[in-house]
Amino acid sequence: MKPPLFLCSGCGIGETLDLAALGEAMEREFATPAKIHPFLCGPEGRAMIEAESASAECPVVLGACSPRVNADRFPANPFAPERVNLREQVAWCQEPGAAETQAQAADYLRMGMARAAKRELPVPVETAMERTILVVGGGVTGLNAALEAARVGYPVILLEKEERLGGLARRMHRLAPRVAPYRDLEEPSIAKTVALVEANPSIRVLTSTQIESTAGEPGAFQVRTTGVGGNQEFTVGAIILATGWQPYDVTRLPKLGYGAANVITSLTLEEMAAQGRILRPSDGAKPRSVLFVLCAGSRDPEHLAHCSTVCCATSLKQGLYIREQLPDAAVYLIYRDMRTPAQGEDFYRRVQEEETIFLTRGQVTAVREIDDGDLSVTVVSSLLGEKVELTAQMVVLATGLVPAAGDVLHLKYRQGPQMPELKSGFPDSNYLCFPYETRRTGIYAAGTVRQPMDSVGCVEDAAGAVLKAIQSVTLIGQGRAVHPRVGDASFPRFFLQNCTQCKRCTEECPFGALDEDEKGTPKLNVNRCRRCGTCMGACPVRIISFADYNVDQLSAMVKKVSMPQKDDDLRILAFVCENDAYPAWDMAGLRRLRQDPGIRVIPLRCLGSFNVVLLADALSRGIDGVILMGCQSGDDYQCHFMVGSELANRRLENVKETLERLMLERERVELVNVGIGDGGRIAEITQQFAAKLRQLGPNPYRGL
Amino acid sequence: MASGLPGLPGLLVIGGGISGLSASLEAAETGNEVYLVEREPYLGGRVAGMNRYFPKLCSPQCGLEINFRRLRQNKALRVFTLAEVEKVEGQAGDFTVTVRLNPRYVNDRCTACGECVPACPVERRNARNYGMDTTRAVYLPGEVAEPFRYTIDPLACEGAKCGRCVEVCRYGAIDLEMASSTVTLRVGRIVLATGWRPYDPALISTLEFGHFPDIVTNVMMERLAADGGPTGGELRRPSDGQPAKRVAFVQCAGSRDQNHLAYCSGVCCLASLKQATYVLERYPDASVHIFFIDIRTPGGFEIFYQRLQADPRIKFVKGKVARVLQEPGGDLMVEAEDLLAGRMFRLPVDLLVLATGMVPEAMPLPPGIKIPRDPYGFAVPSPGIWPVGLAKRPMDVQSCVRDATGGILKAIGGEG
């Protein structure tokens, strides 16, 4: 295959490079004439490309600007053009007219030609998708999720492990205000929501039911349940995990007086209030004073490190209804920070108007039972003094919120039965920009199981998760990936005859897309796959490839890198993450920051797809050094495939042997974290690396 | 996805910040026809001006990059920048919307080569950097601008009588005669994602904003710390360029105050914690004071707060700043109370950052949009029009995206 080649001389490219000479060199090597145009993205240039791309059997190669820009100007039918970045990454950051600049451009074109020749058109695998959405959990979030899905025409199966729907919301006596003027307590609305769900013909409700196992993939999850009606089996398209929360185990808080008769939790108070009987458990008397201890278990690394978010508003609400039911009782509310964000501040102000509710900042360190069931409460760091003792007839512990996560779905995945959880225990997304980015495709957590939130947040979250569930069924049914490679129709292909059953791919897949048979041969669940290529990077025998992205192709690109003429000149390969590091390179170009001309940048879908055989390919050919640029790893990982840099790093640890065999220094290979905002640092990083390589001297394999 | 209500399938999203952008993409990727209208010449809104996000301290550009890639490949989504909704007629299910397209003066032949910039003789106040620097009248709105195309500020440009940019542009991309035009769209639903603006700090007279150059707002601080900002990320005193090593933050500058914004803006505590890390990263020997009423770091954000509390270089002081003075030497002197210690004290600082709150963007809504608002101007859903993100209440980026994603379903499903 001979990809047609076009070169643009605009935007400074023509001034920096001798394009005619480049064109001739390419024609000699690839037997395809290069067409040069001063404005390739203009109407004339476009028409010129269009005329040839229609009949081409492979992508056309465009030596012009970055693939990140002007994408809408070039025809993409059926192949997206192969874009060789001669502008941002050559013309804008190299010395005009220099031999090494010309060599860099020539290499990039050769690499682009090689890549284009090894790009097949991915053919999407369409599947018939089951549209039913399974909602697990019948509390506020689950009920709203079911209603939202049904409203847009998706059948729902709603599972609840308890006998009745409604979850913990059913136990609430009143709600904190959700609408303007944000002053008055609201009647609970959960009964109405339950009635709507029960009356909806598109929603099948299964109460007293739990999941025994979940197998399969988006569009075809096979779920087995067990419950009062016996075992059931059904197929669903997507799953919403809305199992909600549990109060923190209050028995772990003896310091705060739990165990004493008149120390109760917020939830117990709610039930007492619902019955109109706020009485001391010890003697059934009306308490003359009630003290609330906020952050009971929350914001305490020994218990729950997180803030449970809802306890401040809940306690304010409870203070107010105690005021209604027991007008003579004094209410004390000891908080560390009063957290009533947004218009919740109005409600806080409303409660402050009450003369018998005393709100004080402080931290309760101990609650002890004294005479007659009364309680002595030690408060430190308050405005009342460094350390004070207060007495109350009843104490309410505003216990924190724990996600009801864990082994709920019983996934039959090679990587374990539960949704991966963050360090905090919540099966939440780690991404601020993408709260529904999940590691189990087609399964979305929503509501308080995902993160602490109030009921308004739960309703919003339910809708968001349902939209993502519908989206996953829609896109995956078309054979296309969901976030972050939305629309990608490629998928990994396994040449299983050569598989050694080493299990690295099945272990490392960040999304649990690969299962194994008894022998350890990988089995792809294509609808779970997110196309990151981590499996391709993991495979030691190179049997995993995508139609348009594979080790063979990357290896062909590496082989197109020329060797420098002078000892002083270097050849450095930079394998970079295409989402963060690659744009950072472009930004360095935009700022016209000078780079070492010996660099050759190769974008990767993710560093997780970096296969170490490429290292051997590069170093044994005489490349002086290889630098990998990927996203931050660790707790605050940035990688959108979670573990890309981490895996690449681990793989590099294991290449010592390769380097030793080649008798090369370990320093010739490096991995650095580069974020998209690091455009200003790129030049410095590469210069430092180049300086180190110059000290080591040229790769002894150069010219062999 | 079937709509819960009869009517036209199309969806109009007003506002191309993180909420509107997310709403548009999520809707389009679920197979809906979407029109996104943005007033500015670029997408991304306020987050495009942020240096980092809390609590991961990652760059907002990362998410924008992904979103812009999603946008570029989606045929179901049509974007109008420099566009304003002029008129809305009809009702839920059948709106006819007139959109005014303001001239960019740069057409789609622009390659973003930047040759026009040195030719332009006019400097203009750079509103994106809150006036802390200037650009030429022709400028690229950001390093990851979408669309990646230059634009001309008509208020600064001298027009055809200058025309030097037209002469140097080799691509015929500049058209100083470009006129505004209108397009008419027919949609079934409208999503309101009009976002926020910072509260005007000059209205808080005790905090002396505008009187001393070393008093900045939190949004200005984001730009000062940004690599691509007016100072290239150097944190220096605007007055004399000395390193800003003693930095104090005034929380609730306007928020939680019935004379200003009665509500809590929800994000300023976390923004200041994040900005404290900018200072300490730049100058490890720096000291930071944060004056607060309550520190509000809900959910997992609390863990970020705990990490900073453990840093002895950051002092959290519960109390208000009473007065700001300038010392004879030029240093700012903050007079504040420490409620827990029960004393007043004075603190010399290099930079005082006002954690100003968020105000719902008071864009005059076009005739025809009737949407109820709460006393603060936050929108409440009404038939066919669903507000998301900051149009609805103060919230952080993550909550905006959550709300935008769900809001799409609410709008299509027919609630409201």
Question: Predicted regions span which residues?
Answer:
Chain A
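Acidic/histidine-rich
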Residues: A588-G589, A616
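Residues forming the flavin
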Residues: M1-K523, N527-L570, N579-Y582, M587, ...
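C-terminal functional segments of enzyme domains
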Residues: T360-A366, V674-L704
